Amino acid sequence: MNVVVDTSVWSLALRRNTQNGAIPIINILRDLTSDGRVVLLGVIRQEVLYGIRYTEQFIRLRDYLRAFPDIELTSEDYELAAEFFNTCRSNGVQGSNTDFLICAVAHRRGYSIFTTDKDFENFQLHIPDVLL
């Protein structure tokens, strides 16, 4: 099964100073990468590349991320994301547009989601997202 890796995981994995708590997450990402199971949404790629101060670092990271295919999105992905947002909001659960798009894309394709963002655990109470 392919896995949508969320920005929170990429941020941990790409930090210069890795904390001990991040090592298991980094190891899982490494395994998923070597198995060819990692896919990206363009918006996650964009978030990962935001705020890179030095051009050389930006280019190096951009080129590294190009190894991972972007998922082509359809109108149905956006519509389902809106439906998920509305369902969660009506149950008092908040989330970002990007988070609900990740859930919709993963659900429609049978992918799992790899994230450290605890909001996704709240989403699971109301929508069918599959966390790794």
Q: What do these predicted regions represent?
A:
Residues 1-40, 50-63:
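Short, well-structured N-terminal submotif of metal-dependent ribonuclease cores
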Residues 34-36, 64-68, 91, 109, ...:
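Structured helix-beta-strand junction loops
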Residues 69-116:
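Active-site neighborhoods of divalent-metal-dependent phosphate/nucleic-acid chemistry enzymes
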Residues 10, 45-48, 120-121:
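A generic structural signal for short hydrophobic patches within well-formed alpha-helices
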Residues 6-7, 48, 81, 106:
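Generic structural signal for small/hydrophobic residues in well-ordered secondary structure
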Residues 30, 103, 107-132:
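Acidic, PIN/NYN-like endoribonuclease modules and their adjacent C-terminal/linker elements
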Residues 55-59, 88-89, 130-132:
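Short, hinge-like loop/turn segments at secondary-structure boundaries
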